[in-house]
Amino acid sequence: MARSFTNVKVLSALVADGFSNTTTRHGFAAAAAATQSATRGGASIGGNMVPKSGEEKVRGGEKVSWVPDPVTGYYRPENTNEIDVADMRATVLGKKFNQ
């Protein structure tokens, strides 16, 4: 009797797994079809627009090169000036909080 229960358990797991795979594949097919229809002209972005890289967004025509910061080791733009943390806090918070 115990063998039959394990066989039924295995069979039901296979059936349930097959059903799950079928629904997953159907969902993927529907998503792929929606993507293809959108790129054909449904919700497409203008063809003449070219996205700008990060450097072009920052300064317009000026090129920005990124160099490692000698103190922290993180990369930062080369032409940025160093600012003191206390000065930045005073600028951002204003006189109300800096009394």
From Swiss-Prot:
UniProt cross-references to InterPro entries, sorted A to Z: LEA_3a
Region (Disordered), start-end ranges: 40-62
Keyword tags: Stress response
Compositional bias (Basic and acidic residues): 53-62
Inducing or repressing factors: By auxin, heat, ethylene and wounding.
GO CC, alphabetical: mitochondrion
PANTHER family named among the record's database cross-references: LATE EMBRYOGENIS ABUNDANT PROTEIN 2-RELATED, PROTEIN SENESCENCE-ASSOCIATED GENE 21, MITOCHONDRIAL
Name this protein carries in UniProt: Indole-3-acetic acid-induced protein ARG2
Organism: Vigna radiata var. radiata
Lineage: Eukaryota, Viridiplantae, Streptophyta, Embryophyta, Tracheophyta
